Swiss-Prot record:
Gene responsible for this protein: gsiD
InterPro entries: BP-dependent_transpt_permease, MetI-like, MetI-like_sf, OppC_N
Identification of the protein by name: Glutathione transport system permease protein GsiD
Membrane topology: Multi-pass membrane protein
Biological source species: Salmonella typhimurium (strain LT2 / SGSC1412 / ATCC 700720)
UniProt GO cellular component terms: plasma membrane
The keyword Chaperone is annotated on this UniProt entry: no
Length: 303
């Protein structure tokens, strides 16, 4: 007995001690790969800062974005009093850009979220059941893909009317087929795997297989595409507002601000410069973040 205890203690002492921070979990592996993406980290920091600005925009602005007017500084450039200058009505551009982040980001995120939910469900159904389900859903997607996204959004807004809520609906509609095709492709591959056959053999329902086994396998692709799609949605929403179909004055949405700045572009270029830079940096940050997430979630894709 003593010999047995001695051998057991010797084996235990010989075994390497694994510290908690050395245990490899999917989350640790993701973070280890993602933090090597320096550009994506910077982009992620910018996106996080933008989200915080959007949440607290009303408290961060030095002036009221809609009801403050400095009639003595019309179209004045950047100064210590007005960091981004003043527009033709005397409104502080810095305050309007900050509040515009709240509106533009909300429009982009909500539109993509709606499109992702509906598109994911349709993609799961089309890929899993195939047959007439697949043909019907994919033909609808083909019809939607036949039109450029912005033209489809213009048509939807023309029917529903102008306003930021209708812009969200319009942008969401042309996001649906993109998510549906993505999820359908993943579903067609995953449903052939042995673990799906095992789930069927033990009597798992189609709903359980779809949402407990197949959907988790598509999450990484959805997250990456969701992130990159936000940039596209922000541009689309800003374009509609620029055309007068989205947010209406005096709402400080970035696209609407560009529309209002057209008349003073020559004498006061700063009025259009800062909203345009905000759109550019935001879209760039979401795209770079999406690239980094893709490389971290599926390193086989890189290269």
């Amino acid at each position: 007995m003593r010999l047995f205890n001695w051998r057991r203690q010797a084996i235990l002492h010989a075994m390497p001690v694994v510290k908690p921070d050395q245990i490899r979990t999917p989350w640790r592996e993701f973070w280890r790969r993602f933090r090597r993406q320096h550009v994506a980290l910077v982009a992620g920091g910018f996106v996080l800062a933008l989200i915080l600005v959007a949440i607290f925009a009303r408290w961060l602005t030095p002036y009221d974005a809609e009801n403050y007017f400095d009639y003595d500084s019309l179209n004045n450039g950047p100064s210590l009093q007005h960091w981004f200058g003043v527009d033709s009505l005397g409104r502080d551009i810095f305050s309007r850009v900050l509040v515009g982040a709240q509106i533009s980001l909300a429009a982009g995120v909500f539109a993509v979220f709606i499109g992702a939910i509906i598109g994911t469900v349709l993609g799961l159904l089309a890929g899993y059941y195939e047959g007439w389900w697949d043909r019907f859903i994919m033909r609808i997607c083909d019809v939607l893909f036949a039109f450029p996204g912005i033209l489809l959004a213009i048509a939807v807004v023309a029917v529903l009317g102008s306003g930021i809520a209708n812009v969200i609906v319009a942008v969401a509609i042309f996001s649906i087929p993109a998510f549906a095709r993505l999820v359908r492709g993943n579903t067609l591959v995953l449903k052939q795997q042995t673990f799906i056959e095992s789930a069927r053999s033990i009597g798992a329902s189609d709903t359980t297989i779809l949402f407990s086994h197949i959907l988790p396998g598509t999450v990484s692709s959805i997250v990456v595409f969701f992130t990159m799609r936000i940039g596209t949605s922000i541009i689309s929403a800003a374009s509609l507002s620029f055309l007068g179909l989205g947010a209406q004055p005096p709402t400080p949405e970035w696209g609407a601000m560009l529309n209002e700045a057209r008349a003073d572009m020559v004498i006061a270029p700063h009025v259009a410069l800062f909203p345009a830079v905000a759109i550019f940096l935001t879209v760039l940050a979401f795209n770079l973040l999406g690239d980094g997430l893709r490389d971290a979630l599926d390193p086989k894709i890189k290269g």
